[in-house]
């Protein structure tokens, strides 16, 4: 099933009421339910990619008791619903895996507004990704079959994903968090992420002064102008029939988008056959994959290491990297944005790694090394057979 078809099924389930859900028509209400794929788990699939720590997103961890039942945590998001204005949504999954999401807004929303809010949630949580696509990933990389990991959190719109990626280049994670917080506070309706129209109307100098975006100021405004004018056709970029290389080339033509940013935006579009290589890739190559040499050579070797996963290579790379972060900071679904998110600096990670290495006289990454070695061994026969 194509991604677009899966999305249509999810939304039609909600429109028809889903399993006990209120149809998105009639009088304005504050709460409704959203049907999800059978394998979907809110706490696992929200806390799967770093953007869940960036405003206007907020994850509120639950207590240990509800985690044991598999139903913990609240996902909170301020959404811009156009003419309906901004709304703060609180999303939970009270009945656990595969059960409907419960969505509660801070204001009563019309059927049209709830439909738009649901569409944004669908994109963020990748509810339009069919379970068989996740199963295809697990068949290639069995390390993540038991946990069910496969979906990667993203933004409510393509525009937001592009801008968040621009704010994540050549800067610390603290800087990325700060830029997104200030963008939402200064130019977002009610704290939502700013629309293309809003940012297109801002002078680059004002954007730099109010949001600390530095050299990105003019590029962000240019991107906003292109999205607002229709020069960037979101439907074309989201069309799965377009070859990855063609989409990548088109991304690189956009202001502020280089090879790393393009590879990252590709995975945000659901194209997992590319790995965005950066300094974190080098650190991972050295600490987990036991690679030696210059940063440039390690970066290339990391790319080659995951090439055997083909169209799923980003997911294999990312979840391996994510597990490393979790060994340092605990399971991602227990992270609090202002406490844990703010500690993702090179110095803090290095210090945490050193502390972990001293525990019980063993390296903190030994389990990851064993998993990585086992995965590499399983890939070798497949490569030989394909020659």
Where is each model-derived feature located?
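HhH-family (HhH-GPD) DNA N-glycosylase catalytic core used in base-excision repair
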Residues: 2-387
């Amino acid at each position: 099933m194509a991604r677009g078809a899966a999305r249509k099924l999810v939304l039609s389930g909600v429109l028809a009421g889903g399993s006990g859900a209120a149809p998105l028509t009639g009088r304005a209400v504050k709460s409704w339910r959203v049907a999800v794929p059978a394998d979907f788990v809110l706490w696992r699939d929200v806390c799967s990619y770093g953007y869940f720590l960036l405003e206007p997103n907020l994850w509120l961890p639950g207590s240990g008791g509800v985690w044991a039942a598999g139903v913990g945590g609240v996902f909170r998001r301020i959404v811009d619903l156009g003419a309906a204005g901004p709304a703060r949504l609180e999303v939970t999954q009270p009945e656990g895996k595969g059960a409907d999401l419960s969505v509660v807004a801070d204001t009563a929303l019309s059927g049209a507004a709830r439909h738009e809010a649901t569409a944004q949630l669908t994109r963020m949580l990748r509810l339009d990704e069919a379970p068989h696509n996740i199963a295809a990933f697990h068949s290639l990389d069995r390390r993540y079959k038991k946990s069910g990991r496969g979906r990667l959190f993203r933004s409510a719109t393509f525009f937001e994903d592009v801008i968040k990626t621009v704010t994540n280049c050549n800067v610390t994670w603290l800087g990325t968090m700060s830029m997104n917080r200030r963008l939402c506070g200064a130019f977002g309706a009610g704290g939502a992420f700013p629309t293309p129209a809003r940012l297109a109307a801002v002078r680059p100098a004002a954007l730099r002064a109010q949001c600390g975006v530095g050299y990105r100021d003019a590029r962000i405004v240019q991107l906003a102008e292109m999205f607002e004018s229709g020069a960037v056709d979101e439907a074309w970029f989201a069309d799965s029939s377009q070859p990855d290389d063609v989409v990548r080339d088109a991304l690189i033509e956009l202001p502020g988008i280089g090879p790393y940013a393009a590879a990252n935006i590709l995975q945000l579009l659901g194209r997992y056959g590319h790995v965005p290589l950066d300094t974190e890739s080098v650190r991972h190559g050295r600490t987990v994959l036991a690679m030696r040499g210059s940063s440039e050579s390690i970066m290339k070797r990391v790319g080659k290491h995951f090439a055997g996963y083909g169209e799923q290579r980003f997911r294999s790379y990312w979840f391996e990297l994510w597990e490393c972060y979790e060994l340092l900071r605990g399971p991602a679904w227990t992270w609090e944005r202002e406490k844990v998110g703010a500690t993702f600096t090179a110095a803090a990670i290095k210090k945490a790694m050193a502390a972990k290495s001293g525990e019980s006289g063993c390296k903190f990454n030994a389990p990851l090394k064993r998993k990585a070695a086992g995965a590499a061994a399983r890939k070798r026969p497949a490569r030989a057979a394909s020659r």
